[in-house]
């Protein structure tokens, strides 16, 4: 029952809103606009140079064009290439933010309609439940309907930023980047609204989570299988509800690819997480699914065609992804089921989620036995025969984003050796461009997958499903050690599986950091990639390391929207440990994170506009980002400029000094070793105590020497005096520092970029 709905015998009274009960933003700056935070952005750009990497020199945005902007030229509207590149950064960030905003809007409205105005409760150990919302919107939401205030703010600001990319609007590259930061920041708010709403409504884990089975062979293919693909858990919850109502919980397998997989496993841990986005085409072609249910985001544009080819029926459920399918929402349920079972309708769009769930379950049950007999299994003879059709032209390798040695693998397969093809599976990003280029139309991905299946037989792992928020008690225990530097850092491995090489490289980085006592958080497709990394005993990192927000522990927060809890943990350190007020207080909180909390994000396989929005938002809050090499295609990085303004004030005394950390805000690494070194370095903060700085520098120096066989050349930037130098490395480091003319300097106790924070 709604809190504004009264029911008596024979009478129901509904009250829309009560005068005086409307929550209002409080604090210095509730619901800040672009211009409200432009001065904070300028402080960032005064030290971090915006480096542009335009993908194309041409601008085709209006009918004046196309205009060549190369070599200092300007377009017909007057724009230059730097501003145009920044404009596209803002545009792509808006696209990503719009995805999460639409997702959050749908979840909130769906929950209000289906369950009423649910109270927001993230468990007894989480009191600061919505740190991003409180910091930006200015009040603490109590029920799901309160979250609509945040959505209104998001939609208002997103519309403004998007309008700025129109011809004849913004013209300055830094102001475009400022707008990109704004869109990213409100994207982070959308993440929190979506995840908090679904945790409250669907009783997801609240700070702890079980281990679940992971991988395509975790599915019991002797049962009817429903495969959920996308990011919005609402259709999946309806499937689970229908199965429970019918008593079919144990009779039908519910599987998931991408973030829907994490979220449905958070609702019911009997569901199976089978793989990330990069495996979507592979696993659809395997024919595991009797029915594929689509919701939204990260869905391949050819999924309907690919699913139908192996006899899987497809049901689209969101108007964001109608997929050209007939809208049968208003058709009788039994008619839809009959036509899908017969194959007359191989794919349909059903916007009514309850009906979609019923159809999915009933169709899966009825087609399963027939489909099971039709699914082809890997055949070594057929695989060898296909490999012999390869011309060795190399067209596939030229378009492969990872330059995989496909031709060599085909030659080996033609001679009956399939190991080369099988080895490509973990390095394949699943784009299938090789197949589009092949003059003989070889199904290259199928061949790679078949070779892998012949070798693997059965691949099952254990992963920890998403646990959602970080508990307040965890923040109290580690807030001090993080701020002082005794815990060397908090590193988040997030985003897409567009890895530049073997998927297991992510696991190598994470394990190295865990062994060095960093707190590691993960989410989304990267959290799945970690599940594929095992030790010699076959154990995954989730089985080896504890699920706690503490030194040397590994936390999976959940799906992409759960990234809000990663940022939220940093905000909660400011609120719980430092007693900073949150409401409407973005600048002070971001300043605290930038100067005192050693946190960093690694997006090793970044691909989507959503990942750009998430990461760009994090940088505005003061959390630096390391991309993989694909991050260059986002077109702008924020690289430290040693000639910039690195002035930091001591809030106690007003004393000024230069502190060159974190040295970058957005960085792209060429290989995993460079990414690991940068992640460690970007956890260095002005607030580090001598002991904390020693710990951080020891990790930085040891890794740099291991990979590059020399001391880091930028050590003088981070050594304030000899007490910062690790004892075991002191002689070597001090000798080097003296050679390069380093001079000791004093640190400060309360670093801030904000002059208004100075008390002395």
Swiss-Prot record:
UniProt cross-references to Pfam families, sorted A to Z: Fer4_9, Prismane
Gene3D superfamilies in alphabetical order: 1.20.1270.30, 3.30.70.20, 3.40.50.2030
Binding sites annotated in the UniProt record for CO: 100
Keyword Repeat listed: yes
Keywords: 4Fe-4S, Iron, Iron-sulfur, Metal-binding, Nickel, Oxidoreductase, Repeat
Domain of life: Archaea
Function statement: Part of the ACDS complex that catalyzes the reversible cleavage of acetyl-CoA, allowing autotrophic growth from CO(2). The alpha-epsilon subcomponent functions as a carbon monoxide dehydrogenase.
Name of protein: Acetyl-CoA decarbonylase/synthase complex subunit alpha 1
Protein's organism: Methanopyrus kandleri (strain AV19 / DSM 6324 / JCM 9639 / NBRC 100938)
Lineage, top ranks: Archaea, Methanobacteriati, Methanobacteriota, Methanomada group, Methanopyri
Protein's gene: cdhA1
